[in-house]
């Protein structure tokens, strides 16, 4: 260690007034010293390069955040074509469709779930999802489109099916619609794990020649990976969305840029808790990559991190 180099950047106090913008604040985070704020600045710097360079940018996230107002921010990112590929879960399709045509409500973590069940309200953290805004609504919208798409052809790649259903939504508030309109593919490797997937199963029960070609999705992903000069990923939360993103990037020796936002810890060996450092050993992140792990609630972190780019 070089003492002079280590002591080259003094900690500076924040200066905030009525004229301070998020961009100003982010710039001040570069000299704040501790703790998560410094990581936010590092993430901002990485994402800036990710967006500026000839880079294929992945965005991965779980479904729960789409039940919140963070859906609007994700939608704006998609509208501005800041990312090239989305990898997510079946529940994202559910919540995006449901909130396009119905309403979710602000609630509390502390409500009685037994009582909520009795009055047909589902609780997702502190978000309330009434029955009429979810199951039957999604069934109606998806089944209507499946009938139309089935009349065109019997076999569909999931990524194509999602695009066609997205276009049919024709509503600017919808992530699916704007992704389809802007040719940003949405990959859902666990497509059957949600209401959208249940509609696919139900439709198959009535039409046994209806087929979902998941391997075609993987073929499309392989083309994206092998054609990319560089790749970067903004990963919100873990699970299948994060893993599918880093899994495919191992076939090009790993991501060049990565930002991972999580609340999970690594002590239990879980994928969600695994730091990006661990992914280097699996060749899913390059040893010389620029990356950062940020611990915190995505509904707080993402608006602060992404607002300067919008």
Swiss-Prot record:
Task of the protein: Catalyzes the NAD-dependent oxidative cleavage of spermidine and the subsequent transfer of the butylamine moiety of spermidine to the epsilon-amino group of a specific lysine residue of the eIF-5A precursor protein to form the intermediate deoxyhypusine residue.
HAMAP family (alphabetical): DHS
SUPFAM superfamilies registered for this protein in UniProt: DHS-like NAD/FAD-binding domain (SSF52467)
Species classification: Archaea, Methanobacteriati, Thermoplasmatota, Thermoplasmata, Thermoplasmatales
Cofactor: NAD(+)
Organism annotation: Thermoplasma volcanium (strain ATCC 51530 / DSM 4299 / JCM 9571 / NBRC 15438 / GSS1)
Entry keyword annotation includes Lipid metabolism: no
UniProt cross-references to InterPro entries, sorted A to Z: Deoxyhypus_synthase_arc (IPR022899), Deoxyhypusine_synthase (IPR002773), Deoxyhypusine_synthase_sf (IPR036982), DHS-like_NAD/FAD-binding_dom (IPR029035)
Record-level GO cellular component terms: cytoplasm
Record-stated family: Belongs to the deoxyhypusine synthase family.
UniProt-listed Enzyme Commission number(s): 2.5.1.46
Catalytic reactions on record: [eIF5A protein]-L-lysine + spermidine = [eIF5A protein]-deoxyhypusine + propane-1,3-diamine
Protein name (database record): Probable deoxyhypusine synthase
GO MF annotations in UniProt: deoxyhypusine synthase activity
Keywords of the record: Hypusine biosynthesis, NAD, Transferase
Keyword Transferase carried by entry: yes
């Amino acid at each position: 260690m070089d003492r002079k180099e280590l002591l080259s950047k003094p900690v500076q106090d924040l200066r905030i007034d009525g004229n301070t913008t998020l961009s100003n604040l982010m710039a001040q985070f570069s000299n704040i010293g501790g703790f998560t704020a410094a990581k936010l600045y590092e993430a901002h710097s990485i994402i800036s390069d990710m967006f500026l360079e000839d880079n294929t940018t992945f965005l991965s996230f779980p479904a729960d955040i789409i039940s919140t107002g963070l859906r609007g921010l994700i939608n704006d990112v998609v509208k501005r074509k800041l990312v090239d590929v989305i990898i997510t879960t079946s529940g994202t399709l559910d919540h995006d469709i449901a909130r396009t045509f119905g309403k979710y409500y602000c609630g509390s973590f502390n409500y009685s779930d037994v009582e909520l069940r009795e009055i047909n309200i589902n609780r997702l953290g502190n978000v309330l999802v009434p029955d009429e805004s979810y199951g039957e609504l999604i069934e109606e919208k998806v089944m209507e489109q499946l009938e139309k798409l089935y009349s065109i052809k019997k076999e569909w790649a999931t990524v194509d099916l999602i695009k066609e259903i997205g276009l049919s939504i024709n509503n600017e508030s919808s992530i699916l619609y704007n992704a389809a309109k802007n040719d940003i593919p949405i990959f859902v490797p666990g497509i059957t794990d949600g209401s959208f997937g249940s509609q696919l199963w139900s439709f198959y029960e009535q039409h046994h020649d209806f087929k979902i070609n998941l391997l075609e999705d993987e073929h499309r992903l392989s083309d994206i990976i092998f054609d990319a000069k560089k790749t970067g990923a903004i990963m919100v939360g873990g699970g299948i969305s994060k893993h599918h993103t880093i899994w495919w990037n191992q076939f090009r020796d790993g991501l060049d840029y990565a930002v991972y936002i999580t609340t999970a810890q690594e002590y239990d060996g879980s994928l969600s808790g695994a730091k990006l450092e661990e992914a280097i050993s699996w060749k899913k992140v390059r040893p010389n990559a620029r990356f950062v792990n940020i611990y915190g609630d995505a509904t707080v972190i993402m608006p602060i991190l992404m607002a300067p780019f919008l």
